[in-house]
């Protein structure tokens, strides 16, 4: 996870967080390095009302269907490139 995190934190869009793995433009990020970790990542994001982002390796996109992700949950890669936008309500 250190290699992934070190790549992710280099992005200007990512900041550190004590509560989450990181923050993407102020929203929670949970890292899922494999498809086996996706379920746990969803559970963690439910603590943020389900709104946030899952960060995964770009190569994992072939292993699962991003359309199966909740609309409240976005997807970013190891370089913090947006792969699927989260539908976050306006405040």
State each model region's role.
Residues 1-25:
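Acidic-basic catalytic patches of nuclease active cores, encompassing PD-(D/E)XK
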Residues 7, 45-48, 67:
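Alpha-helix C-cap/termination motif
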Residues 9-13, 28-35, 85-87:
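Short low-complexity stretches enriched in small and charged residues
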Residues 59-91:
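Domain-level recognition of nuclease-like catalytic cores that cleave nucleotide substrates
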């Amino acid at each position: 996870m250190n290699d992934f995190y070190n790549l992710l934190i280099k992005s200007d869009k990512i900041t550190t967080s004590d509560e989450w793995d990181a923050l993407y433009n102020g929203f929670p990020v949970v890292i899922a390095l494999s498809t086996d970790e996706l379920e746990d990542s969803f559970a963690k994001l439910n603590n943020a009302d389900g709104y946030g982002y899952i960060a995964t390796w770009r190569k994992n996109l072939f292993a699962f269907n991003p359309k199966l992700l909740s609309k409240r949950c976005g997807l970013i890669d190891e370089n913090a490139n947006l792969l699927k936008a989260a539908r976050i309500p306006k405040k």
